[in-house]
Amino acid sequence: MLENLKKYKIVLASNSPRRRNLLSGLDIDFEVRVISDIDESYPDSIDSMEIPLYIARSKAEAYKPTMADDELLITADTIVWTFDGVMGKPANREEAYAMLHALSDHVHQVITGVCIMTKDKNVGFSVESAVCFAKLGDEEINYYLDKYKPYDKAGGYGIQEWIGYIGVEAINGSFYNVMGLPVQKLYQELKHF
């Protein structure tokens, strides 16, 4: 599939094993390339829906000087947004606990921004999914944190893990977006390269 991509070397610029797994599911050959210490800050003035795309574009710009003419780069960033604002990745157990406690018994938004870039083209998009969590008890939150240590995940949880099985009541939107890469939309966009 996607014969148009055969002219490119596809590069996924991500440390995320979930993004690697999801992109593999599209049956696209790619390599992973990671630059450490990319600035993931954003201006306070931008809307929450724009934050992930802003960061995904910043990541792409960091890679641009090293890109070969035949490379197609994919970058992404995911945030969790609640009534209290943006949740990124928790720095420690205490932050992860506070995040899960805040998500418990509420609906939150998961927004992923994706940037696809070649030397001549740069396309970006965002996908939003609403996730409804059941009420989580302290015992359930502590069990999850002790066993899964979700410190590399926006909002402090992985929907594909135990907490998703027992805590997610409903999703409106893409499940794969909540995992970190909206592969259906990505596939549609890749058709145009």
From Swiss-Prot:
The residues annotated as site (Important for substrate specificity) are R18, T78, Q160
Q: Which cofactor does it need?
A: a divalent metal cation
Q: Which GO terms describe its cellular component?
A: cytoplasm
Q: Which cysteines are joined by disulfide bonds?
A: none
A Gene Ontology biological process in which this protein takes part is: nucleotide metabolic process
Q: Is-annotated flag, keyword Mitochondrion?
A: no
Arranged from A to Z, the UniProt key words for this protein are:
Cytoplasm, Hydrolase, Nucleotide metabolism
Which top-level group of life is the source organism from? Answer: Bacteria
What EC number is given for this enzyme? 3.6.1.9
Catalytic reactions of this protein: dTTP + H2O = dTMP + diphosphate + H(+); UTP + H2O = UMP + diphosphate + H(+)
**Positions of the catalytic residues:** D77
Q: Which InterPro entries does the UniProt record give?
A: ITPase-like_fam, Maf-like
In alphabetical order, the GO MF annotations are: dTTP diphosphatase activity; UTP diphosphatase activity
Q: Where found in the cell?
A: Cytoplasm
Q: Which HAMAP family match?
A: Maf (MF_00528)
Which family is annotated?
A: Belongs to the Maf family. YhdE subfamily.
Q: What is this protein called?
A: dTTP/UTP pyrophosphatase
